[in-house]
Amino acid sequence: MSTPWLQTLAALALLSTGVVYGTDVFFALVARPALRRTDEASMTRVLGHLHAVGDTRMPLIGATGLLATAGLALAAGGWHTRTGSLALLALLGLLTHLLVYLRVAKPVNQAQTAAAQHDIIPPDARALQTRWDSVISLRAGALTVAMSALLAATYQLP
């Protein structure tokens, strides 16, 4: 595959994944400790509305990063080349992030969104957030692997 096409896939993968990466790292480093200082009502309302917007807009960005990374891995030759291998490592990081999001974070997001939309504070509001918090470092770590591998793959391009 031509170098401009590989560079385009790499740029698209980096830009899209970078949005998700930045969001999760922000929540791991800033939002999580700040939210621990808030009351359940404020936390539920703010996070419920954030998740309502985020869970509508972020899937397109995440899917773009995932597909561009998969395309880069395939177009660069997969395990047979250094660029392809690095792109596959990035893909593994993205898939790990997605799996953890779907299994743990998304159900919490949906519960918080429903609570905020109906203006109710669930009795387990803090437990819900603790569940979400329990995987944010893993998600951010998986995305760090993905971003690092994508950057390294990009440096390998001619």
Task: Tell what function each PLM region has.
Residues 60-72, 139-148:
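Core segments of transmembrane alpha-helices
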Residues 95-104:
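Mid-bilayer segments of alpha-helical transmembrane spans in multi-pass integral membrane proteins
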Residues 151-158:
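Juxtamembrane boundary at the C-terminal end of a transmembrane helix
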Residues 7-8, 17-64, 109, 113-130:
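Interfacial loop at the N-terminal end of multi-pass membrane proteins
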Residues 11, 52, 88, 130-133, ...:
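Internal alpha-helical transmembrane segments of multi-pass membrane proteins, especially GPCRs
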Residues 4-18, 74-96:
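Interfacial segments of alpha-helical transmembrane regions
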